[in-house]
Design a protein with these regions (language model features):
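Adenine nucleotide-associated cytosolic modules
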Residues: 1-264, 275, 289-292, 297, ...
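Helix-biased "structured C-terminal domain" signature
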Residues: 176-676
Length: 676
């Protein structure tokens, strides 16, 4: 793409619109460097609400400058300039800061509307600010009084003049290309804040339609960075962290507004919040590893995984129909595990009944069993859409099950499938009350996991229990449990976590680090929430959200629900539990196809929805949602559990030798699960 700049034949003429001290100062300063053409900002209201700006056609570029914040005016001016392929620069004042930029260049993504969208998503108080701006729109747009002094206006005007010079003759040096410059009007400190263009931008975005052709997946060789690893390019060092920080993290307009470290816990941790465009919902990426840098990188990459899974960011959904209309072009939603009629009859149940004539939006995925593209319900593939649309439009409760980010498509699919395996194994064990083997902690001697356990037990006084929950696909899965065997007052009785990986040691390490994260906060949470927890013990319907499930089992009153595991008669060493594992492959694609084959061999399909957006591709990431119809989905909230129609719950325990016969529905575990 060529670098756009102010049109050279009109470069000496800059259209200047606006009012107030900022506008007056800029008019005077620019008069000595170029021809300034005053622009009329009076509204000549057309049907689309855009402003009519006389003289724009005679300019090589334009500036809109004012002493307040008027997003409606900014949006209208942006539309007028884009319609004329006219470069322009925004200058305004908001709450103690002057903001310069972004410069909007014709034919290039990244405009003032993109910047505002990123800004809104980055703010933790976006909802409150939106309400204030709506109620006090006139006050927000008015001059900012004492915040903008003559000295401050002179500084900002000088920065604007220099920026216009860059846009005229050296656009590659412009500081406001996909960035905003903020000037603290109290301290006169200048900072630059880069942002990524919004592919969904109504003004400059150009998302392609989601098509059947684009959904085809042809796996390619993916050489591993090391034979013992499972990544094509592991991210772990300071250089990787700094690059990701620069790309994604900015307090003002970043996809990730902050990255915080937690250094007061057993193991390094980090947190990266992320907002959803056109919504006030925020999610979080978190990292819990053995080094600070790795924890920060994990938090950033998990946040970017959330970004891809919450809502489409790479393709525009175009298919809307019923399953009855689509037939074999679509996934049968009844294979995903639905809510039962009993659940639908509950007062206020938020999900609608599914039936084949229900009209849904669909996105294209790829079925490895059918070896062709397959339509998947959009609300199943993107779990954040519930925050932008009424919940009643969804027919199931779904979350980040099977979502993963990878250094290539093959890596992302593998890790998405491993998450499906982890959660399916945990819930199969829970609902079918499988007395899976205990893994002897003493048999871990010499492994990293043994050191993690030693630190947890020494620091907290809890005893760690490990169980092998590997299911019929033979993917190593573990359930770990921290039990307060001393029955200390005000201490949570038990906490659980899970892990899955082709390398069982990594599965165990990941589960233990997740357990350590819980232990850090559990004691205080138990003391503060004791009454609420006891209410959930008495009434499982009070277990409503993810944050309720683990605390329920802090209560010693319900420890007996876990005795089917704690009292299991089966016991193995770590090597006995995971012997016979295939040797390492040099190519990750080989690992992926072997893993997919294990599901296909047990009658389960593997479906992949590519969620990769332009923001992921900038760092050569791939983002996916892996769906395995028939696997038990992790759902939070007792009323939302989804086990209706999942036949594996009844017979897999029998086939694996844990039960003498297949179960019937009345024998399934009726209690809320303890997954964190």
């Amino acid at each position: 793409m060529t670098t756009a700049s102010i049109a050279p034949e009109r470069a000496d003429t800059v259209g200047l619109a606006g009012q107030g001290l900022m506008h007056t100062t800029l008019t005077r300063l620019l008069a000595g460097t170029c021809s300034v053409l005053p622009l009329d900002l009076s509204l000549n209201p057309p049907s689309d609400g855009a402003a009519a700006h006389a003289g724009l056609d005679a300019c090589g570029g334009a500036v809109l400058a004012g002493d307040g914040w008027d997003p409606d005016l900014h949006r209208a001016f942006n539309a007028e300039c884009l319609a004329r392929a006219l470069p322009w620069l925004l200058v305004y004042v908001e709450r103690g800061h002057a903001v310069i930029g972004p410069c909007t260049l014709p034919g290039q993504a990244g405009c003032s509307l993109c910047a505002q969208t990123r800004r809104n998503a980055a703010r933790f108080d976006a909802q409150e600010l939106s309400q204030l701006a709506e109620r006090f729109a006139t006050e927000f747009a008015a001059p900012s009084g004492s915040w903008l002094t003559t000295c401050g206006a002179e500084l900002v005007a000088a920065l604007v003049a220099d920026e216009l010079g860059c846009l005229t003759s050296r656009p590659h040096q412009a500081r406001t290309r996909n960035a905003v410059v903020r000037v603290d009007l109290a301290e006169l400190v200048v900072s630059v804040h880069p942002f990524l263009p919004d592919p969904w931008c109504a003004a400059c975005g150009d998302l392609p339609d989601d098509t059947e052709q684009s959904a085809w997946i042809v796996t390619r060789p993916a050489p591993k960075a090391s034979l013992a690893g499972y990544r094509v390019r592991p991210l772990s060092g300071a250089q990787d962290r700094d690059r990701l920080l620069t790309r994604y993290v900015d307090a003002q307009v970043g996809i990730i507004p902050s990255l915080t470290k937690n250094g007061d816990s057993m193991f390094p941790g980090a947190r990266a919040p992320i907002g959803l465009r056109h919504s006030f919902h925020q999610s979080n990426g978190s990292g819990r590893t053995l080094t600070v840098q790795a924890a920060e990188i994990t938090a950033i990459t998990e946040a970017m995984e959330r970004y891809g899974g919450l809502a489409p960011c790479g393709k525009r959904t175009v298919v809307r129909a019923s399953y009855a209309q689509l037939g074999d072009k679509a996934l049968d939603p009844t294979t995903l595990g639905l809510h039962s009629e009993t659940q639908h009859a509950l007062p206020g149940f938020r999900y609608q009944r599914y039936h084949p004539d229900l009209t849904l939006s669909w996105v294209w995925g790829y079925s490895f069993a059918r070896q062709r593209p397959l339509l998947v319900p959009e609300r199943y593939a993107y779990y954040g859409l519930r925050h932008r649309e009424p919940a009643g439009r969804a027919f199931v409760s779904e979350n980040s099950n099977g979502c993963a980010l990878g250094g290539c498509l093959e890596e992302a699919i593998l890790y998405g499938l491993l998450e499906v395996a982890e959660r399916d194994a945990f819930l199969m064990t829970w609902y079918a009350r499988l007395p899976v083997p205990r893994v002897e902690v003493a048999s871990l001697r010499g492994r990293t996991a043994a050191l993690i356990i030693e630190r947890i037990e020494h620091t907290t006084g809890y005893t760690i229990h490990i169980f092998d929950t590997t299911m019929e696909q033979r993917i190593p899965c573990v359930w770990v449990m921290a039990v307060d065997e001393q029955d200390r007052p005000d201490q949570p009785k038990v906490m659980c976590a899970a892990g899955a990986h082709l390398d069982p040691e990594r599965a165990l390490e990941g589960a233990l680090l997740e357990l350590a994260r819980q232990l850090q906060y559990a004691t205080r949470g138990y003391r503060d929430d004791r009454d609420r927890i006891l209410a959930m013990v008495a009434d499982p319907r009070k277990v409503r959200v993810m944050a309720d499930h683990a605390p329920l089992y802090y209560a010693p009153e319900v420890f007996d629900r876990l005795l089917f595991l704690v009292d299991t008669p089966r016991q193995q060493t770590f090597d006995e539990a995971f012997h016979g594992r295939p040797g390492p492959n040099a190519d990750l694609s080989t690992d992926l196809h072997e893993t997919i084959g294990r599901y296909l061999d047990t009658g389960l399909d593997v479906i992949v929805v590519d969620q990769t957006g332009p923001e992921h591709a900038l760092e050569q990431f791939a983002c996916v949602k892996v769906i395995v119809p028939g696997a038990v989905p992790m759902v939070f909230g007792y009323d939302h559990r989804r086990i209706h129609g999942l036949d594996r719950l009844y017979h897999v325990g029998y086939e694996l030798g844990y039960h003498p016969r297949p179960l019937i529905h009345a024998e399934l575990n009726p209690h809320p699960h303890p997954f964190p």
